[in-house]
């Protein structure tokens, strides 16, 4: 009987040693997203519950607007970001100013600045990398496959439209409630989107970046369609207000009131909705222009 009790105790001890110790559950991530496309991608990956703060460009989906704001991406406050106790800050290349980013690093907050690039492939790469940062590799691969399939369909549609009509000369106008209107040259998000949609940027050969709109230059390039953001068009008083800008009313686009406007983040954000943006833009600029 004594040996039996000893064996039982030994067996129980052995089982206790073999049983796995309960592990502490990892604390949830607290992500601050600085960039509308980054926020949009986090939602597409299903990581929205880990978001604790966003910047003012994070307008899609609508639920993102209910999150605490850290302000404008280019004018961040270190105190504002740190007050949200983030365990990860993900930002686009436009985030700043640099002293604020250095302050975040000095506070030992993990900061990842994602590469920009106005290409479809760059958007996919950013999405996959963002998924890896959130421990959502499978969701990242699924999202990549989804947008690639959409992109293939869109490219085929744009090619078909380009065969049916002459690619139009398009002018992208960036406007705000205050300040002079600017037009897009090459090496801009607008230039890339116009090209993907099958249009020719009216200032694509003239200069890089954005420059103030001047009547002489606009009349000289004779755009057939004007592209703007919905926010910019509203700020200038709609189509009527936009065409009051010197020179625009004298262009072919102005004379026919050919103005196409898309929501800013959709058009210029280079997020997961990029195929949708290109498809919408292409249909709008090609439909009324038969060969």
Task: Explain the meaning of each model-derived region.
Residues 184-210, 230:
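His/Asp/Glu-enriched short active-site or ligand-binding loop at hydrolase and phosphoryl-transfer sites
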Residues 35, 93-94, 116, 206, ...:
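Short secondary-structure boundary segments
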Residues 2-5, 10-26:
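N-terminal export signals
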Residues 85-89, 199, 221-226:
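Alpha-to-beta junction loops
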Residues 29-100, 202:
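A short, structured surface patch at a secondary-structure boundary
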Residues 27-30, 99-178, 201-204, 208, ...:
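Extracytoplasmic substrate-binding proteins
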């Amino acid at each position: 009987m004594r040996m039996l009790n000893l064996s039982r105790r030994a067996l129980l001890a052995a089982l206790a040693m073999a049983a796995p110790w309960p592990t502490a559950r990892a604390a949830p991530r607290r992500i601050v997203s600085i960039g509308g496309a980054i926020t949009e991608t986090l939602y597409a990956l299903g990581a929205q519950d880990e978001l604790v703060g966003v910047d003012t460009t994070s307008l899609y989906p609508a639920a993102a607007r209910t999150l605490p704001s850290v302000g404008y991406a280019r004018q961040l406050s270190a105190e504002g970001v740190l007050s949200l106790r983030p365990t990860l800050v993900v930002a686009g290349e436009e985030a700043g100013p640099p002293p604020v980013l250095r302050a975040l690093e000095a506070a030992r907050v993990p900061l990842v600045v994602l590469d920009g690039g106005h290409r479809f492939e760059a958007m996919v790469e950013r999405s996959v990398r963002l998924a890896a940062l959130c421990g959502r590799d499978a969701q990242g691969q699924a999202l990549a496959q989804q947008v690639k399939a959409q992109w293939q369909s869109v490219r085929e549609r744009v090619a078909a439209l380009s065969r049916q009509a002459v690619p139009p000369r398009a002018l992208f106008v960036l406007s705000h409630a205050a300040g002079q209107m600017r037009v897009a040259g090459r090496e801009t998000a607008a230039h890339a989107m116009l090209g993907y949609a099958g249009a020719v940027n009216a200032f694509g050969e003239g200069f890089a970046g954005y420059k103030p709109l001047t009547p002489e230059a606009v009349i000289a390039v004779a755009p057939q369609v004007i592209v703007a953001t919905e926010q910019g068009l509203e700020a200038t008083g709609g189509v009527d207000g936009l065409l009051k800008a010197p020179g625009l009313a004298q262009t072919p686009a102005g004379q026919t009131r050919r103005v196409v406007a898309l929501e800013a983040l959709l058009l210029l954000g280079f997020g997961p909705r990029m195929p949708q943006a290109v498809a919408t833009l292409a249909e709008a600029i090609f439909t009324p222009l038969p060969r």
